[in-house]
C-alpha cells in the first residue's frame, strides 16, 4: 500500500468521512470537517503508522491531504 493510500485510510478511519471525499486537495478543516482534536489525532495516527515524528510547527503546515502525503514521503526518504 502506498503512502497516499495509507494516509487516505487513516483519514477515513479517524474522521469517519467517505473515502470519495478524501482527495489530495481536500482541506482537513474546510472540506472534511475536522476540528483541532481531530487534527491532533490524525497527526498521532500518522506518526504511529509511519514511524515519523511530526513537530507542532510541521503539523500546522499540514492543511490538505496532499500536504500530509508529501510530508510523510519526505520524512521516510530521509
Swiss-Prot record:
Domain Carrier: 1-76
MF term (GO), any: acyl carrier activity
Gene name tied to this protein: acpP
Pfam families per UniProt: PP-binding
Keyword Cytoplasm: yes
Species annotation: Solidesulfovibrio magneticus (strain ATCC 700980 / DSM 13731 / RS-1) (Desulfovibrio magneticus)
Pathway: Lipid metabolism; fatty acid biosynthesis
GO terms under biological process: lipid A biosynthetic process
Keywords noted in UniProt: Cytoplasm, Fatty acid biosynthesis, Fatty acid metabolism, Lipid biosynthesis, Lipid metabolism, Phosphopantetheine, Phosphoprotein
Protein name in the entry: Acyl carrier protein
Family matches, as HAMAP family: Acyl_carrier
Upper taxonomic lineage: Bacteria, Pseudomonadati, Thermodesulfobacteriota, Desulfovibrionia, Desulfovibrionales
Localisation per UniProt entry: Cytoplasm
Amino acid at each position: 500500500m502506498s503512502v497516499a493510500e495509507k494516509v487516505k485510510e487513516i483519514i477515513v478511519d479517524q474522521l469517519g468521512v467517505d473515502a470519495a471525499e478524501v482527495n489530495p486537495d481536500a482541506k482537513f478543516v474546510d472540506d472534511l470537517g475536522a476540528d483541532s482534536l481531530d487534527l491532533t489525532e490524525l497527526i498521532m495516527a500518522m506518526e504511529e503508522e509511519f514511524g515519523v515524528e511530526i513537530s507542532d510547527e510541521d503539523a500546522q503546515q499540514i492543511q490538505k491531504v496532499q500536504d500530509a502525503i508529501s510530508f510523510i514521503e519526505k520524512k521516510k526518504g530521509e
